[in-house]
Amino acid sequence: MPIRIPDNLPARKTLESEGVVVMDSSRAARQDIRPLQIGLLNLMPNKERTETQFSRLIGATPLQVDLTLVRITDHQSKHTSEDYLKTFYKTWEEVREQKFDGFIVTGAPIANIPFDQLRYWPEMLDIMNWTQTNVHHTMFICWGAQAALHHFHDARRYRMPAKAFGVFRHQILNPRSPWLRGFSDSPMVPVSRYNDIDRTSLGPDLEILIDNPEIGVCLLDDPKHRAVHMLNHLEYDNRSLADEYERDVKAGLDTPVPANLYPDGNPIAEPENHWRSHAHLLFQNWINEIYQTTPYDMAQIGR
């Protein structure tokens, strides 16, 4: 089944060119099924690229999905026009009375700012609490995962000696997890972060599913809060890390070449994607598990 996204969203052309089936409202209305309602709180500067990355993965699942793009209510984007946001996004205040089968909270490039010093932290607290009453299952990603682990579990975040940057092999710790159906034993995962979570601060109600002893925890299951926490970036496209590297080089920053991204480590070559299949598996598993467990009557979500 296809994904339904806002009409005229620029991501549509990219998705259709890749073979992702995109559905308009009239066609969706003719199908006598309840589509899954998925929300995406997009905290990344490049909204269009991020929404395309997630739509690509959600739209490849065999179920009809309605995707709602959500943004922080009182925050002025420096990289996306207000017209674009008003056309394609809803503020969290506009959706806070809605129920969602699934909700995604993205990362954000604010690793150096303490949580309580972030201007929109109070709204983030409200959103995280709201997921416990209005969302059947939530996926928190990178900074979003760090924030949720801090809020729900008082997990300690610390600065690593050097930025973890590249594509790294990880270990599967629980191959029986429904989130990891079809995963190989040692998936490659894109990583781009300065911080890690102190694993000694993780309580017994959290299960580490994917790990790298040197790079840090990758994926955590949080059944108490009906959530998974992805500390890295399986959603990234081929050039996400490469563009970040080239941006830093142009800015004069001493950024290392992303590990295991380029053939023979040569940044002039085109990046090689070693994680695409696992990205699709994770999101297909997530959507399927939501479909199997969410109430048909959305009013029952969170009860």
Q: Could you describe each region identified by the protein language model?
A:
Residues 46, 75, 111-112:
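Active-site loop signature of alpha/beta-hydrolase-fold enzymes
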Residues 73-86:
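N-terminal beta-loop-helix "entrance" segment that forms/cooperates
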Residues 100, 105-174:
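Cysteine-nucleophile active-site neighborhood
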Residues 1-72, 89, 95, 99, ...:
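Amide-donor transfer/coupling interface in amidating biosynthetic enzymes
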